Amino acid sequence: MFMTKDLFFVYIFTTMIKLVVLDVDGTLTDKSRMISVNAVNAIRNLKTKVALVSGNVLPVLYGLKIYIGFDGYIFAENGGIALINNNIEKFFEKDGPESFLNDISGYTSARGILTNRWRETSMAFTANHDEMDIIDREAASRDLYIVDSGFTLHILNKGQDKGFAVKKMIDIMNIDYNNVLVIGDSQNDESMFSLGTLSACPGNASEKIKEMSNYVSGKCYGDELFDVFRHFDLIH
């Protein structure tokens, strides 16, 4: 069958993409973390399998999964813990991050946040910007690292990131990297953007994420999803 160039690329996209991986804060939500109704509708219109990957905690992502209404994987705490086929799987421990936060809270402005009570593999905190070099160095000395989601700072174990989560899903589904579309906006999304999957971001994304993206939407804070899905011909 003869295809024009445009039809060929539409065919490639629709046959390639078997999983859409979505960040939450700044990708589905606005600056105040209010979820975009347009984002919810876009996800509900999508026939491709959807997964959420976030620095937030598993109970929050589980609530989003239920109330948005999709049947897919959820990876919380930047890939540290997941709900896979109704089973909770934990890939890292919180002992190191928790001990580190307790220690640095004694001599820096670092303070834990409310959701730490539900964290099982990481810790989250706020701190003065001018102390971050000290905090970063101390984290590295303990085989930990700090990542900024744009909303809070996360203390993570070595190897714990969203790229780890995407690799897990690729293995579970037995698909290739080019079968995956990732969408995110900030520093803690960079690990999944570096895998060689298809990638897109909203207009509010960091400059680094924009540079790493195959497609940058002109729309922001969740309103980009319809645009991105149309670009990859996942919805019409």
Curated annotation (Swiss-Prot):
Active-site residues per Swiss-Prot or TrEMBL entry: 23 (nucleophile)
Enzyme Commission number(s) from the entry: 3.1.3.18
Family annotation (Pfam families): Hydrolase_3 (PF08282)
Catalytic activity: 2-phosphoglycolate + H2O = glycolate + phosphate
Residues the entry annotates as binding substrate: 162
UniProt-listed InterPro entries: HAD-like_sf, HAD-SF_hydro_IIB, HAD_sf, PGPase
Key words of the record: Carbohydrate metabolism, Hydrolase, Magnesium, Metal-binding
Annotated Mg(2+) binding sites: 23, 25, 185, 189
GO cellular component: cytosol
Cofactor(s) needed by this chain: Mg(2+)
A Gene Ontology molecular function term of the record: magnesium ion binding
Protein name, UniProt field: Phosphoglycolate phosphatase
Organism per entry: Picrophilus torridus (strain ATCC 700027 / DSM 9790 / JCM 10055 / NBRC 100828 / KAW 2/3)
